[in-house]
């Protein structure tokens, strides 16, 4: 059985590149899409350890462009891999008039077009309930960290690596690891995977809690507003401790100007913080 299973893993070699076809595309909101890529057969799984991600590679205007993404599908899904990606269009952001190279390339892909996948990649592995393996860099040996409570700070599509862990941990009701998510977005419309996150928060209250903050909240908004602050972290995430790990994923300003300074201010040490 194990031999057959290995044969049906798509990402057999982390250095190889696997061309996968686009088989479905769904518009989630004005600038976010779900892209579904087909695996070599309906029985194949991607073969991605929980905590890891993939790279997509494409030749765009004679330049090799490589970007990292965490799928929202898992190895419970056969025959396909799903990515949720925000498209950075031209002339929207004054700092980036050209927009995103890879995201606009994906947006222009037609059904049946292929793109190269490479992986698994990553420094974090969810080994077994309450145990993470973490590499300090790509080449180092993974170190074991026992975790009772995972805090999560996510901005925009930075939710995808968090969702991977949330799904995996809540699937096992005997896993006592707690997770608390602080999820930052610009507007209410930008909150990705909201329905699923709120469902999990309701059905797995002993494992998962959820809090939002919005840059531009609507009137009557019940959650926080503005950039992530130390007070928000203090109120909604686990305090510093040996069995605490805070995971951070999102755009650079969220990480460098909000999450990291606030965490340091509250006394979280480097070994309590993991940034994707």
UniProtKB/Swiss-Prot annotation:
Reaction catalysis annotation: 2 Fe(III)-[cytochrome b5] + NADH = 2 Fe(II)-[cytochrome b5] + NAD(+) + H(+)
Top class in the EC scheme: oxidoreductase
Alphabetized GO MF terms: cytochrome-b5 reductase activity, acting on NAD(P)H; FAD binding
Known EC number: 1.6.2.2
Residues that bear Phosphotyrosine: 18
Coiled-coil regions listed in the entry: none
N6-acetyllysine modified-residue sites: 17
SUPFAM superfamilies named in the record: Ferredoxin reductase-like, C-terminal NADP-linked domain (SSF52343), Riboflavin synthase domain-like (SSF63380)
Annotated positions binding FAD: 107-137, 146-181
Record's GO cellular component terms: endoplasmic reticulum membrane; membrane; mitochondrion
NAD is among the record's keywords: yes
Occurrences of domain FAD-binding FR-type (ranges): 15-127
Taxonomy, superkingdom: Eukaryota
Presence of the UniProt keyword Hydrolase in the record: no
Biological process (GO), any one: sterol biosynthetic process
Cofactors named for this entry: FAD
Entries under Gene3D superfamilies matching the protein: Nucleotide-binding domain of ferredoxin-NADP reductase (FNR) module, Translation factors
Keywords of the record: Acetylation, FAD, Flavoprotein, Lipid biosynthesis, Lipid metabolism, NAD, Oxidoreductase, Phosphoprotein, Steroid biosynthesis, Steroid metabolism, Sterol biosynthesis, Sterol metabolism
Family statement: Belongs to the flavoprotein pyridine nucleotide cytochrome reductase family.
Function description: NADH-cytochrome b5 reductases are involved in desaturation and elongation of fatty acids, cholesterol biosynthesis, drug metabolism, and, in erythrocyte, methemoglobin reduction. Responsible for NADH-dependent lucigenin chemiluminescence in spermatozoa by reducing both lucigenin and 2-[4-iodophenyl]-3-[4-nitrophenyl]-5-[2,4-disulfophenyl]-2H tetrazolium monosodium salt (WST-1).
Protein name in UniProt: NADH-cytochrome b5 reductase 2
Highest classification ranks of the organism: Eukaryota, Metazoa, Chordata, Craniata, Vertebrata
Gene name of the record: Cyb5r2
């Amino acid at each position: 059985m194990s031999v057959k299973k290995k044969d049906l893993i798509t990402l057999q070699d982390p250095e190889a590149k696997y061309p996968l076809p686009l088989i479905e595309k769904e518009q989630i909101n004005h600038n976010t899409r779900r892209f579904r890529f087909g695996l070599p057969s309906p029985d194949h799984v991607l073969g991605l350890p929980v905590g890891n991600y993939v790279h997509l590679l494409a030749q765009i205007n004679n330049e090799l462009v490589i970007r990292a993404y965490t799928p929202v599908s898992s190895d419970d899904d056969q025959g396909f891999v799903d990515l949720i990606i925000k498209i950075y269009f031209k002339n929207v952001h004054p700092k980036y008039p050209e927009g995103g190279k890879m995201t606009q390339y994906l947006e222009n892909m037609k059904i049946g077009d292929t793109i190269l996948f490479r992986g698994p990649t990553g420094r974090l592995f969810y080994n077994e309930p309450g145990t993470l393996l973490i590499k300090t860099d790509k080449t180092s040996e993974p170190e074991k960290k026992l975790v009772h409570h995972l805090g999560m700070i996510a901005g925009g599509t930075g939710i995808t690596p968090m969702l991977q862990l949330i799904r995996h941990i809540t699937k096992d009701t005997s896993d006592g690891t707690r997770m608390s998510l602080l999820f930052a977005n610009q507007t209410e419309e930008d909150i990705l995977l909201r329905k699923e996150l709120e469902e999990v928060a309701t059905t797995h209250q002993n494992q998962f809690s959820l809090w939002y903050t919005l840059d531009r909240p609507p009137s009557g908004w019940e959650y926080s507003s503005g950039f992530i602050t130390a007070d928000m972290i203090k109120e909604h995430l686990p305090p510093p401790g040996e069995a605490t790990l805070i995971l951070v994923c999102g755009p650079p300003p969220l990480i460098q100007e909000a999450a990291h300074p606030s965490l340091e201010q509250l006394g979280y040490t480097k070994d309590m913080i993991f940034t994707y």
